[in-house]
Amino acid sequence: MEKSGFSPVGLRVLVVDDDPTWLKILEKMLKKCSYEVTTCGLAREALRLLRERKDGYDIVISDVNMPDMDGFKLLEHVGLELDLPVIMMSVDGETSRVMKGVQHGACDYLLKPIRMKELKIIWQHVLRKKLQEVRDIEGCGYEGGADWITRYDEAHFLGGGEDVSFGKKRKDFDFEKKLLQDESDPSSSSSKKARVVWSFELHHKFVNAVNQIGCDHKAGPKKILDLMNVPWLTRENVASHLQKYRLYLSRLEKGKELKCYSGGVKNADSSPKDVEVNSGYQSPGRSSYVFSGGNSLIQKATEIDPKPLASASLSDLNTDVIMPPKTKKTRIGFDPPISSSAFDSLLPWNDVPEVLESKPVLYENSFLQQQPLPSQSSYVANSAPSLMEEEMKPPYETPAGGSSVNADEFLMPQDKIPTVTLQDLDPSAMKLQEFNTEAILRSLNWELPESHHSVSLDTDLDLTWLQGERFLANTGLQFQDYSSSPSLLSELPAHLNWYGNERLPDPDEYSFMVDQGLFIS
């Protein structure tokens, strides 16, 4: 800035540091800023140079930690003898050291590593020092002139010596320049306004006035000032305080919204499934397992609990099962679903045993093909699994000391199938009306006399297929005594020696009642 007689270019800087590496780095950086640099490794040597050339340096940059003299001691000597601006620097930025440097008269405190941007503006300290001297001599009362000169010279220096346009800030420069020109006129000197301190009583009056008017756009500074009735308070003071008060209220509203939102998220985390799990755990029920039979294998077991905790056998249709807290219901189904049948189950699902097929033994002297006894039967292994002979063990274990739970909770209400047992069968409902009795008997390798008519069999016998069993039951001719008939068969077929899925111990110990007209032509 040539008009004021000061230019940042060629600023004379004395750098004091005991580290030669940092001396070289700072020397290169300062020279890039077009400064004249002098380096020194000892504080006493730097003090000697300053005394010899009192007007030879504009600013001093010194390290705090020096081997021969403390950096703060050097700062005191320079401030008392030469009155030059001194910048202190160090590796650590402890608050105590920074405050000590400011108290001893340091104009700035830099931390290593020092940036180029910080070195480019050290000339401002020199300019402020000179302006302060001018104000002290001429009695200049305007304090904004130094700031304006600082900003203008900084823009001039960083812009390469060219004028830099600041847009709207240019008006501020013109205004401050005009004030500098009128500094010699006492009447034109501006006085700084006193800052208003909002005490508790004053703020209480302000809040009451706002509440009377309403905290909205209608609450203007003029109305509030009239209601407060404070003589020395201005409209600008009320407007500034009103703006801060509205910002405070908006922050409170945002805080409430965040609390409400966080509370809503926490309540939404509890899903209906959790409620269902809790209620299912507290109120156990009782039911039985039901299995659907058919030719197709299990298609899919959906959503099985990965941690099986209870086990139960299917031998008892109404078995009590101890169930842990469950998260999802288990459903086992077949495609296509056929009739339901209940059977005993002891083997696990993954172990499907080989099916044993019994071959009947043919007797030449009997017109009926007799089924062999278990000791006489020959079995053939079949690799195809049979659902009627598979025995299952669901992956649940019964914990000790648990509560009884109804197993019907495994099935959805619409998927529950009534259980059918031998005692619940209705003979009239299980009749095979569409089959010829003769064809059925021939398929079982039964030999019939040639003179026998199949019509009589259909009319006399009321044959019923018991589901889940392997024989026909004559349900029509019941409660009739034929024990005195001499025409009873001498040999009773072995397959008729089964009753209720259990084989009789000895066929000779029991007398069977057979219709005399069963095999008479």
UniProtKB/Swiss-Prot annotation:
Coiled coil: none annotated. Its main location: nucleus. It is found in: Nucleus. SMART domains: REC. Detected in the whole plant. Predominantly expressed in roots and stems. Transcriptional activator that binds specifically to the DNA sequence 5'-[AG]GATT-3'. Functions as a response regulator involved in His-to-Asp phosphorelay signal transduction system. Phosphorylation of the Asp residue in the receiver domain activates the ability of the protein to promote the transcription of target genes. Could directly activate some type-A response regulators in response to cytokinins. PANTHER family: TWO-COMPONENT RESPONSE REGULATOR, TWO-COMPONENT RESPONSE REGULATOR ARR11. Binds the target DNA as a monomer. This is Two-component response regulator ARR11. The lineage of its organism: Eukaryota, Viridiplantae, Streptophyta, Embryophyta, Tracheophyta. The gene is ARR11.
